[in-house]
Regions:
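Extracellular glycan-recognition surfaces and repeat-rich motifs
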Residues: 1-45
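Extracellular acidic, Ser/Thr/Pro-rich low-complexity tracts
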Residues: 32, 76-78
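Short beta-strands within extracellular/lumenal beta-sheet-rich domains
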Residues: 38-39, 44-69, 105-106
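Extracellular carbohydrate recognition
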Residues: 48-54, 125-143
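Extracellular beta-strand-rich recognition modules
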Residues: 55-76, 84, 116-125
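Short, surface-exposed beta-strand/strand-loop-strand elements in extracellular ectodomains
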Residues: 83-90
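Extracellular carbohydrate recognition and processing domains
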Residues: 90-114
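Extracellular calcium-associated, cysteine-rich motifs in secreted modular proteins
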Residues: 144-180
Length: 180
């Protein structure tokens, strides 16, 4: 019903719909990002290490979008967190690995324009049950202007609504606490 489906032949684990925590202590989210809806996640209890779970989109037509992007929230909390990848037409275009804390983070990735694209999220389990990763709020649209949103940065962009991690401060340093 939502345009996403689990890969059935090329992986060995599935994404699951949930809404109030993954059931394992010290891993996964406690709620979806808006607190009250659903998210999808990989339940790694009993999965074993280095198992792959892939969720696919139906083909997405980007011809009517000026600057097509996919925006999504992800949660990667757990001591033995694995890797989350975004693939577009079978090519990895974004990847995160390791424990990123008990928080929802948001990413926005450009998509090819004037085409039909297949979007996939692939989760690779870590070495133990504390590698439950989750996805929420998956949206394909013209995107939100991205750039440096820190007013103290040398390259602050007043039109940016999403921080893209490009902020520079002193002599090209990306650490806002730098004194050099």
């Amino acid at each position: 019903g939502n345009g996403w489906y689990n890969e059935s032949t090329l992986d060995n684990w599935d994404w699951t719909v949930d809404n109030f925590g993954t059931g394992s202590f010290g891993t996964g989210p406690g709620n979806d990002i808006t607190i009250g809806g659903n998210y999808i996640y990989t339940e790694t209890s009993g999965a074993g290490s280095n198992k792959t779970a892939t969720v696919n989109s139906l083909c997405v037509n980007t011809t009517n979008l000026t600057t097509p992007n996919i925006r999504f929230s992800y949660h990667m909390f757990g001591a033995t967190m694995g890797t989350l990848e975004l693939l577009v037409d079978d090519v990895v275009v974004w990847s995160q690995s390791g424990n990123l804390g008990d928080q929802w983070l948001t990413a926005q990735i450009p998509l090819p324009s004037d085409s039909n694209v297949l979007i996939q999220f692939r989760g690779l389990t870590g070495t133990s049950f504390t590698s439950d990763m989750a996805l929420d709020e998956l949206v394909v649209d013209d995107g939100i202007p991205a750039g440096c949103t820190d007013t103290l940065a040398a390259n602050y962009s007043p039109t940016a609504s999403v921080d893209d991690g490009s902020c520079t401060y002193v002599l090209g340093c990306t650490d806002s606490t730098a004194n050099n």
